[in-house]
């Protein structure tokens, strides 16, 4: 009998520990272990990796990651109600699961992990985008992680893989595709979750590139892209006027028409503009 078979069904775990998903924490529990195993497999061979999981809840994906052979899992959970359920998993997989009760935005996972590291998570909806941007914009590259396998609302997932000219194209697409290969690998309907959210979800897999696609300073690129898309319907000469007094000249030097809008500009041109603004 494998370790996962010694654990009670997740619905029993939720009932015995009186767990209910809290909207304030962005929680939706995924209880189908066939689905959590499928998500874990999207992260690839984990046998020689430490895996970081954010917001494990009662531990559905945690079980999947361990059953699929993760060398070790570090799970960061803000909701103390979930800790007893996670402790049961830790007992079944002795030495392979460490649980930290805290806020993922405030904890340095590297103090608890050994490379190589991958990240796999059904991210809490209220912090998922902020965490992704952090993981994509460290000053030094390559990052501490090899790959990200992350569940988002379908709309957010589509923004990560969007192309220029589309309504979904924006800051997330540019930052993700600058430093990673990004693709949607799974879709999940609302009824897969407890409680069912109002929208569908999708799993995005991002693999870190050895080098960014085009040279640019991460902080400058992130700032410029944020400014451009905060006013995406404005011409860039207006949206970016706070970035430099001679912004029209900088745009032209980067090969961008000042009258273009952000959604029309490809990644390579934004990187060229970031380099111009760094001079």
From Swiss-Prot:
The keyword Plastid does not apply. Pfam families: RrnaAD. One of its GO terms (molecular function) is RNA binding. Its EC number is 2.1.1.182. It is found in: Cytoplasm. One of its GO terms (cellular component) is cytosol. It catalyses: adenosine(1518)/adenosine(1519) in 16S rRNA + 4 S-adenosyl-L-methionine = N(6)-dimethyladenosine(1518)/N(6)-dimethyladenosine(1519) in 16S rRNA + 4 S-adenosyl-L-homocysteine + 4 H(+). Belongs to the class I-like SAM-binding methyltransferase superfamily. rRNA adenine N(6)-methyltransferase family. RsmA subfamily. This is Ribosomal RNA small subunit methyltransferase A. It comes from Ruegeria pomeroyi (strain ATCC 700808 / DSM 15171 / DSS-3). The gene is rsmA.
